[in-house]
Structure formats: structure tokens, C-alpha cells
């Protein structure tokens, strides 16, 4: 089974991190891997990548004429892949050496049409003590209560997800209006795609936590204002997904909210009462504030969608 790993990049200041991502893919224990790199409308960056890697036999390089965003960039990559499976990783991530091998194990051991793994944090400037693990998803890291091994979920994170190539092609790829592009705030492009996949095939993404990818959490991603803004637009995006795809598109978020309020919050309160701690208190406060902020974004989405 051949795997095509797609890396999209667009900012020159991220070049060192892009190199880390690229080398982590090159260091995989699984051999049958090709790499497709898409530079999103940055000619200077494209020339730099071409100068350093243009002659690499395992790498195909493409540059978009304009900055079209992550979703459209990944769609453009589909024109160049030749593998049976397309695996996606971001330019600020580092794959464990067994990442591809563990994804392939899912396809070879099950009838999965999509597979994804666990995102682990690489705290660039230290772990923020106020951020509860239940909300690690805001910084692109697998959170407490996500899923059990082998469970079929709607989607894993966009930097650790894969699809059978024919499935991606039959779905016409990602919705280009959703996902990162400059300051655009409609997030979660993998959510929209996987919601359509569930409607079309009745299937989700098989979760294998042993397929690990580390995500670099830069200092600015742990800034409280940034986190609250991201939480707001995540809530907005969940409502947008319901409108764009179906009312069931945010079912997993509803189930997580129930688990959060009925299991995790009571557990945290008990722990705080029995063993008082300032970090525990800060995390509990942040948990409530983020939950309310996401709800506010969702309500705003109701007005817009």
C-alpha cells in the first residue's frame, strides 16, 4: 500500500518548522511513501523549497499561483498524488517514526476508508498551567475524552488524518470556502469533509492513538485572548457546519459537552475540594469561560447561518 503524505506551507518564517515536518516524514519506518508539498502562493518560499529539495526523488513540489488557503491547497495536492492513501500533516507538526506504519495497519486490518491518530503537544514555550486538557483541541492537540482506540469518529485532527485516495476524489476533496486562509474565521475544514463522508458512505475515521503526530504549540497559541477568540470562532464554525452539511454535523461536540458537564466538571470540583491547588482552580475557571465563549460563538452563528 503506497501512502502519499501531503504538506502545505505558505509562510517563510515557518521554513525551519516545515523542514522538521518534512524530515519526520522522511524518517518513517514504513517505506512506500511519497511526499507532495504545496506552497500556497509564495514564490520566494517556493524557490527556497525548490532549491533545497527540488531534486529529491521522493518529493513532488507545486506552487499555487495565488494564496488560496489550506483547503484548496490540499485539493491541488490531489492532482499529484499516486498513492492508495493520502495522509495529511501540517508544517508545524512532527510525525512519530511509526506514524504512517500505524495508519497503514488500520487500513490493512479493517475495512476503514479513513484513519487518523493522536496529536500530542510540543510546548514550545512551556505548558500553560491554566489550560485544561479538555480544551487542548483548541491548540490542535488531542484532548481528554476524545475517543477509544479503534473507535470510528467523525474526524481526527487535520494534521493527523488520512483517507483512501478514491474516497477523497469521489468527495471532490475539501470545501475551499472552509479552512485557514489569512484571517478567515470559518474553521474546521476536515470536519466539513468528514461530515459529507459520513453522509455519503455512512462511515467515519478510525482512530488509532498509536499513530502519533506532535504539534508545536507556539507561545502565541497559549495567549488567553487568542484562545478565547479561537473558542468563539470554533463555536461559530460548529453552527456553520450544521447549516452547510446537516444538523448532525456537531453531534460529537454535543456528546462531548454532555461528558464535560456530567463527568469532567464534577471530577474536577471533587479534586479541587479534596486537594486544593491554584492550577486546578485556574483550569476550572478557564473551562467554564471557554465553554461559555464557544456557546456565544454558536449563538452568533445562528444569526449568520
Language-model regions, residue ranges each:
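Short, acidic, metal-binding catalytic loop of nucleotide-sugar glycosyltransferases
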Residues: 22-32
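N-proximal low-complexity "stem/linker" segments adjacent to membrane-targeting elements
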Residues: 1-24
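Non-catalytic, C-terminal membrane-associated alpha-helical segments of glycosyltransferases
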Residues: 229-233, 247-305
